[in-house]
């Protein structure tokens, strides 16, 4: 048991999916996993373990933002020895050729969070996905006939930011904005683990197109299937 996760050590698999929304964790467990049991309800941040195609998999909500996901992934790696962590979340597109409901594989993540500068004493550390996970996810997407987007995302500290520089980020090739990937990749590197963010575009910052809260909670199955298939091939 850790501070924020009330599970016994053996109750969490070494491969885990990480949605921000705990209700999406519940949806994934009920829809995709066999024999799923809930191992965590601390602070309402639900966690489940079950099997997918015979492979033991866990799914844990992380909450929103760098501080929240940092707590959960640190405890998962430090207290439960989780080896493979795949974020399944949403993002806002900032490129014209990226459409709502497209699936993005985050190869790298830049950020305006001070987390890494504090960690590295002012150095601009560049967090990246694990190549094996990225390659596997891309190949699975192609097998499924998906038009996956692969590239850089931006991890924002503020959801409502009056000074956001989305146009500049877009000029530099950033595909979308979200709030957790930089922390996930940095901490996975620290602990020597594998990490990847598989993201569904829930809204388009340039056009204003968006999905509903219900859609964000209970759909986006293509992203989830890619993540699960990637996890069990490790």
Swiss-Prot record:
PANTHER family: FI09636P-RELATED, URIDINE PHOSPHORYLASE. Phosphate binds at residues 20, 24, 43, 87-90. The gene is deoD. The active site is at 203 (proton donor). Belongs to the PNP/UDP phosphorylase family. GO terms for molecular function: purine-nucleoside phosphorylase activity. Keywords: Glycosyltransferase, Transferase. It catalyses: a purine D-ribonucleoside + phosphate = a purine nucleobase + alpha-D-ribose 1-phosphate; a purine 2'-deoxy-D-ribonucleoside + phosphate = a purine nucleobase + 2-deoxy-alpha-D-ribose 1-phosphate. GO terms for cellular component: cytosol. The keyword Glycosyltransferase applies. Its EC number is 2.4.2.1. The record marks 216 as: Important for catalytic activity. Catalyzes the reversible phosphorolytic breakdown of the N-glycosidic bond in the beta-(deoxy)ribonucleoside molecules, with the formation of the corresponding free purine bases and pentose-1-phosphate. Homohexamer; trimer of homodimers. InterPro entries: DeoD-type (IPR004402), Nucleoside_phosphorylase_CS (IPR018016), Nucleoside_phosphorylase_d (IPR000845), Nucleoside_phosphorylase_sf (IPR035994). Coiled coil: none annotated. The keyword rRNA processing does not apply. Disulfide bonds: none annotated. This is Purine nucleoside phosphorylase DeoD-type. A purine D-ribonucleoside binds at residues 4, 162, 178-180, 202-203. GO terms for biological process: purine nucleoside catabolic process. It comes from Anoxybacillus flavithermus (strain DSM 21510 / WK1).
């Amino acid at each position: 048991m850790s501070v924020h996760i009330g599970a016994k050590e053996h109750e969490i698999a070494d491969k885990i999916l990480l949605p921000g929304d705990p209700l999406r964790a519940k949806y994934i467990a009920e829809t995709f996993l066999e024999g799923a049991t809930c191992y965590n309800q601390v602070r309402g941040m639900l966690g489940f373990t079950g099997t997918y195609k015979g492979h033991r998999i866990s799914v844990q909500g992380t909450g929103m933002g760098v501080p929240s996901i940092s707590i959960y992934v640190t405890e998962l790696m430090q207290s439960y020895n989780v080896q493979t962590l795949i974020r399944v979340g949403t993002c806002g597109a900032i490129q014209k050729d990226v459409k709502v409901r497209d699936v993005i594989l985050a190869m790298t993540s830049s950020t305006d969070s001070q987390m890494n500068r504090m960690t590295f004493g002012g150095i601009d550390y560049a967090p990246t996905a694990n190549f094996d996970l990225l390659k596997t996810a891309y190949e699975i997407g192609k097998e499924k006939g998906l038009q996956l987007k692969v590239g850089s995302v931006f991890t924002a500290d503020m959801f409502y930011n009056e000074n956001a520089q989305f146009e500049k980020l877009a000029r530099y090739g950033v595909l979308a904005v979200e709030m957790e990937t930089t922390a996930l990749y940095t901490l996975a590197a620290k602990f020597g683990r594998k990490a990847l963010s598989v993201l569904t575009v829930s809204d388009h910052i340039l056009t204003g197109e968006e999905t509903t809260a219900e859609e964000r909670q209970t759909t986006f199955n293509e992203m989830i299937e890619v993540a699960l298939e990637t996890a069990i091939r490790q």
